[in-house]
Amino acid sequence: MDMFSLDMIISDPAAEASRAGKKQLRGVQNPCPSARARPRHKSLNIKDKISEWEGKKEVPTPAPSRRADGQEDYLPSSTVERRSSDGVRTQVTEAKNGMRPGTESTEKERNKGAVNVGGQDPEPGQDLSQPEREVDPSWGRGREPRLGKLRFQNDPLSVLKQVKKLEQALKDGSAGLDPQLPGTCYSPHCPPDKAEAGSTLPENLGGGSGSEVSQRVHPSDLEGREPTPELVEDRKGSCRRPWDRSLENVYRGSEGSPTKPFINPLPKPRRTFKHAGEGDKDGKPGIGFRKEKRNLPPLPSLPPPPLPSSPPPSSVNRRLWTGRQKSSADHRKSYEFEDLLQSSSESSRVDWYAQTKLGLTRTLSEENVYEDILDPPMKENPYEDIELHGRCLGKKCVLNFPASPTSSIPDTLTKQSLSKPAFFRQNSERRNFKLLDTRKLSRDGTGSPSKISPPSTPSSPDDIFFNLGDPQNGRKKRKIPKLVLRINAIYEVRRGKKRVKRLSQSMESNSGKVTDENSESDSDTEEKLKAHSQRLVNVKSRLKQAPRYPSLARELIEYQERQLFEYFVVVSLHKKQAGAAYVPELTQQFPLKLERSFKFMREAEDQLKAIPQFCFPDAKDWVPVQQFTSETFSFVLTGEDGSRRFGYCRRLLPGGKGKRLPEVYCIVSRLGCFSLFSRILDEVEKRRGISPALVQPLMRSVMEAPFPALGKTILVKNFLPGSGTEVIELCRPLDSRLEHVDFESLFSSLSVRHLVCVFASLLLERRVIFIADKLSILSKCCHAMVALIYPFAWQHTYIPVLPPAMVDIVCSPTPFLIGLLSSSLPLLRELPLEEVLVVDLVNSRFLRQMDDEDSILPRKLQVALEHILEQRNELACEQDEGPLDGRHGPESSPLNEVVSEAFVRFFVEIVGHYSLFLTSGEREERTLQREAFRKAVSSKSLRHFLEVFMETQMFRGFIQERELRRQDAKGLFEVRAQEYLETLPSGEHSGVNKFLKGLGNKMKFLHKK
């Protein structure tokens, strides 16, 4: 039988001993032996001959064998064994003689096949029950004769004798090894596993010797080393029966062998060390492959070993990968790590942490190389105690992490990580890594705990917040318009730097006298002190006489949920008698009935009677005209409780032919928003031109509309004949303080000095009367003066246009701001007036005054304000950026912005530090510490002004509103005040107090010594 081809049968010096003694038996089994095996017969030494003759003495009884033709033939079992042994030994000799190049791992893999060939013996109990007895760390040629002799022994006595010798040799060679319990390779599952694998393989491959095919044919060799059909058929017929029979004997021998209890299995650490180094360096598995793969399908269906470009499968033990390398544990760990990182670098999109979890879930080395690198993602900041070595330059931050996990992994991953910006690399690595222990870092010399601790604050430029009290940071955070910067610079130049002390500093200096370089000691004359005391007395006396009205802003908040307007009226001129003057009368009213209580109805009726007088204060001067350009104006009605209602009027000429008298459409509302109601009046005028009957449906739709919030827009639908249903957009701006305000008319009517005097009189809530010959100029100037006192509100009587019939109101002892036409001036002179400022807008002069208006305001602040107002036109020309904050309406102009910002800065200088002295009480109510607030100002003249100004109703309303307002609600004044506070030095004392505190600190220091 051609069991092996000629090129595979190569003599081996170790096998010569067995061949010399078994010539006859070999001739029976293989009548045509290889010619290349005979010349080596003479090179036998004494040891080999003794082994050969020992084997001849124990020739077992022949075992029946079935031939290819179906007949049984009794062949010695040693013949089958020798045939298989010769085949295997000739292959080993090929590698050793160099006739076919190979590696040491190839030789060891084939020796593994020689061990399993013994499974064909009728009684190979020692061979299959101990399948790895030949596997020894001291594997070499000296062991081969002993192993060959063990294969030939079939007699029980001889086997027992050899087993005892083997036990003695093992005791001598492995005395220092720690005994371990038998592993899975010693359990009874091993022979069935080999039997199953060996019996399945011939069926899949088409037959052949089970010993050779099961060991020689590896998944990596199937392509190049597949047996030919003739050889397969020959092997199928000759070897199937002995294979099955040998398996039965294997199980009987392994169970009932009397020598098994005396066999001490080899220690497991040595076997692990052995098969860890016996794999092929080409990537072929070693001896441990079959042991560790029991749960896998048969060998032909096994997938090839995973390539480095993919993560290793979880079912393959990590020893398969380490078998290629040396037995050193350190080298083994590093190469596994490198292979894994190479796979992650080639597939960079795969998470490195996930790959390590897949491939290295069972690490059997002495120390875990990943324990200081890998960790599940942490919720807290892993960089909390690490210092950044990089510096932030502008918007680019360069961060150096000497302790970065990338420093402990191969270059493939390090270069890939370093290709990204440092900041993004930090954010991406923090999900998968925790930093190395600082003790290990200091041991390696890459860093020390004192140098690796970063701030816990984010390093992104977008996450940087500017602290209060840093002027540069404050200006970086909020873009301040150039106009505001110019105005602030003028104030600083004219009056010097003003220092405001904090709350604690003001409390310390309450009992002391505060003076500094800004104190105006030269102005502290007896006359000025006397005038100051007189003003203080007058303000307090008027405050007792006048009712305390709520502030206008809080009143608007109270009525936000009410209707958009209260009523709409149409006023016309009629003659009661021929030759008499025209009298204004109500011709139309909506709604017809006022749904209010009796008190409000009585007040509303009084107002309805007075509205025609405000719509036509110059009724006696009118005559019928043929053409008239419509005009818009407004007036204000003040109730008994101080509530204020605005009247928005549109005077126009009704439709018709010939000469006609004009009529006025008036909307009365609590909301002070001129642009919104001007839009409604435009729609009224358009529908009035079509038919007067269309006005009432429009006003009904507007009244039913919701009240708009600040900056919001409401939609009103109304039917218009010829156009269908129209949608009217009504927008309420964020800041309506400059609407319907024309500062140009005010400056054209008054000089800067007169304007500042009127402004000072209003701040002390004095009585002021404007005189003008035109209704439009009178109305505009009154509205402009009220707008100048923002963020304060005029709390008293305010009548921009007073009808001549109501001129006696000017005799009231309460503060007021009233506008009169020049035609009412003779009547005014006949009335007994008390402390009132009468301003002639036509001639820009004061008709009556109190002679102290020029000394009310702090001197330096007044000079700075006047300087800005003198340069208003130049500043307005430079202002080409549009509205500063996007809050102003379409009527806003650069001049309006310049004037408004100048007066806002004035109030910031006076009361901009109020927020520092608002403290919360037990019920979370904020209250102003008035005395500390006043004494926080260093300038004496400013403290004197605050002493009087804080007694006014407008200041109390201002503070009351801020105490009740939410802290997050900020208007233009709050924004400018915050900018001002950011420019102040924090905690700086002035004058003597600063010196005394420094002296006290020195005394404490000396006392400690």
Swiss-Prot record:
One of its GO terms (biological process) is retrograde transport, endosome to Golgi. The modification Phosphoserine is found at S551. Keywords: Cytoplasm, Cytoskeleton, Guanine-nucleotide releasing factor, Phosphoprotein, Protein transport, Transport. Residues 566-715 form the uDENN domain. The keyword Transport applies. Residues 503-513 have a biased composition (Polar residues). Residues 15-153, 171-334, 434-479, 498-532 are annotated as: Disordered. Pfam families: dDENN, DENN, uDENN. Residues 737-870 form the cDENN domain. Residues 45-59, 130-147, 218-247, 275-284, 434-443 have a biased composition (Basic and acidic residues). This is DENN domain-containing protein 2A. It comes from Homo sapiens (Human).
